[in-house]
């Protein structure tokens, strides 16, 4: 496990409290080597955004290796069916090809959708993998669009 910092712990608690208070942002980018925090915030979002009895219609979960950015954007831009709000989550987003293409969603986000991207960087330096590049326009747009947690 990556070294826990007080900054990430404090930020985790602040985001957790916002979610528990029902203050949902339209976009969450949860990334980095702190897999525990990513999993906990993702689970909390999935448990909180849509009531349990509406999850069949209001909760969509994709896995990065199995979905394109275009499909994620298309789903997130759809109006929720038979529910007030929907949550679209991409788990293992580090496996996606062209994750930065999700950036087009920021131009026309749906107020009835919460989009969560869970991107886990490898903890083991011997394993290949990458983290989100903070210099990209995708990262900068994500910061403006919602919550970015590392």
Task: For every predicted segment, state its role.
Residues 1-150:
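Conserved beta/loop motifs at nucleotide-recognition and modification sites
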